[in-house]
Amino acid sequence: MAAAKWLIASLAFASSGLAFTPEDFISAPRRGEAIPDPKGELAVFHVSKYNFDKKDRPSGWNLLNLKNGDISVLTTDSDISEITWLGDGTKIVYVNGTDSVKGGVGIWISDAKNFGNAYKAGSVNGAFSGLKLAKSGDKINFVGYGQSTTKGDLYNEAAAKEAVSSARIYDSLFVRHWDTYVGTQFNAVFSGALTKSGDKYSFDGKLKNLVHPVKYAESPYPPFGGSGDYDLSSDGKTVAFMSKAPELPKANLTTTYIFVVPHDGSRVAEPINKRNGPRTPQGIEGASSSPVFSPDGKRIAYLQMATKNYESDRRVIHIAEVGSNKPVQRIASNWDRSPEVVKWSSDGRTLYVTAEDHATGKLFTLPADARDSHKPAVVKHDGSVSSFYFVGSSKSVLISGNSLWSNALFQVATPGRPNRKLFYANEHDPELKGLGPNDIEPLWVDGARTKIHSWIVKPTGFDKNKVYPLAFLIHGGPQGSWGDSWSTRWNPRVWADQGYVVVAPNPTGSTGFGQKLTDDITNDWGGAPYKDLVKIWEHVRDHIKYIDTDNGIAAGASFGGFMVNWIQGHDLGRKFKALVSHDGTFVGSSKIGTDELFFIEHDFNGTFFEARQNYDRWDCSKPELVAKWSTPQLVIHNDFDFRLSVAEGVGLFNVLQEKGIPSRFLNFPDETHWVTKPENSLVWHQQVLGWINKWSGINKSNPKSIKLSDCPIEVVDHEAHSYFDY
């Protein structure tokens, strides 16, 4: 039992004199969403914790008592990939990755109050996840997803024949997407059933591919699609799933349909919102998401954007009647926020939605028949919402969330009432000890066109009478934001606790502040956003006495990496002691090498060959900009980043080196646009924080701060001189 204690809280990690170290950050327990049982008494959630000594991440499943917040261990079996409630008291269904079928998984059934008596219902001949279940007569129908072969069978990688050649041949896009070369396999939703005999259920191994009959359809859609891309009606008879429009080029357009199909696959799936279809509202042809059946199964709510090539357009709630030819209805269509998830109340009269609002992921409610002018009401909760589930048949919801100061917040929220706290990780995990909301505050500054929001993040033990170097962190996207949420990659608090005050701006292009601010970055990447950042920096310099801008640094990833490269060639670049650019674009024309062409074609108002001047306008490699470079810069780029080729980072480093500017190149051959592997993440932090600490003077003022020499990886240096001797 002692070995499982970290599953309940965590074991203390031996840290340095710094309050919140990269080791603390990486090794802190990570908890998944809490899913309540049908009665609203218990919730189950996944938890894992990285162990630096053993170089592994054991995981397991916990139970959360929804009355008092107590947590208990359900199982420490790391092979269990998911658990869901069977719908019958405290009985559960889980997927076990070790199975008698090579490359397959086992479906097991147990009871949350007596887990040891689990039994195997059957096997699935391939990787399979995302279970959703519903009773249908004497059976329990389910859906989940896996990869499909071109024939429609569930793909089993372990059983696949080895190809005679490594060649890849393409006649259409995508060639590669995010971090993967696209192959002939594709994601598909499969249906099956658990049959009851006596007091046990069994599965015969038979699955029906509901997506394959629609040529060129795919669901869930990669790289981030999951179980939220499909739903099963409460009677288990009908399935809804999301797929990109099969007839349109997927790399160029974002148009997405919601398909409806019988659970048994007796008919081919049909879209309810086909572009220019008789039911689809006029002019609505963008990305769809979050399909969910009403409790009676007669309606489907989903979200959809209007623009066909814009991934950051505003989502609007839509409701369609199942099996009807009536036009799809738009709900609260004038609301200037972009909902992300929608669910029905148990009586089908109210919709609960999450949406980003002023840098916080909030929960809202609105009537299911709300007029266009209706403004949804906020449900009180702490931090940002990651997911939510109804507690029994009540109006209360169990929220799984996080914030800038805690990586897990479990709470119960009820419209019109204060939230009820169940478990906040920063109050339990030793690694997060000392983190709290008091060190976080918003900052509003007049920007290029409107007021711009930023977060100020202070270090542990902050003293307003002392002065701290500025860490100016620029988010990616560009249509994204620094939210009141926990990041497992770029975490402002880790930076702050090296001895900085972090300012994390949300300039033009950011989401959650109204669609106009998001849209205004179009064809203006280095325009208004750069001016916003200059104004924020000037405000900090002139008005916040405890921030030292003379010894500040700037860093960013993706669009933030581009902006750091842009800053290097402009006046603001001379205001920083050091720069860090992670996966940022360098040469304007290289953007054509990206995967999702709709992104660049929207943001630069045309194709690469028709609007070349727009791509060149924001080219960081222009000779007149490169001539101004002088600030020491760390460049990071990874081999499996197929959004922005690693050649971008190498080219940037080449120029920095040839100009004699102190610089370093950090590369992970096994990472993507993000760095996610624990040991790589530690090296990333050692290099990034060591770099900025060297140039900002933190290494001198705080001997316990991270130094470049703390990283055990040997540096490749074949030159007779070293910039690091300067």
Curated annotation (Swiss-Prot):
The keyword Signal applies. Residues 269-291 are annotated as: Disordered. InterPro entries: 6-blade_b-propeller_TolB-like, AB_hydrolase_fold, PD40, Peptidase_S9_cat. Residues 1-19 form the signal peptide. GO terms for cellular component: extracellular region. It holds the Pfam family PD40. Gene3D superfamilies: alpha/beta hydrolase, TolB, C-terminal domain. Its main location: secreted. GO terms for biological process: proteolysis. Keywords: Aminopeptidase, Glycoprotein, Hydrolase, Protease, Secreted, Serine protease, Signal, Virulence. The active site is at S558, D641, H673. Glycans are attached at N96, N252, N605, N699. It comes from the Eukaryota. It is found in: Secreted. GO terms for molecular function: aminopeptidase activity; serine-type endopeptidase activity. Its EC number is 3.4.14.-. Extracellular dipeptidyl-peptidase which removes N-terminal dipeptides sequentially from polypeptides having unsubstituted N-termini. Contributes to pathogenicity. PANTHER family: DIPEPTIDYL-PEPTIDASE 5-RELATED, SERINE PEPTIDASE S9 FAMILY MEMBER. Belongs to the peptidase S9C family. This is Dipeptidyl-peptidase 5. It comes from Trichophyton tonsurans.
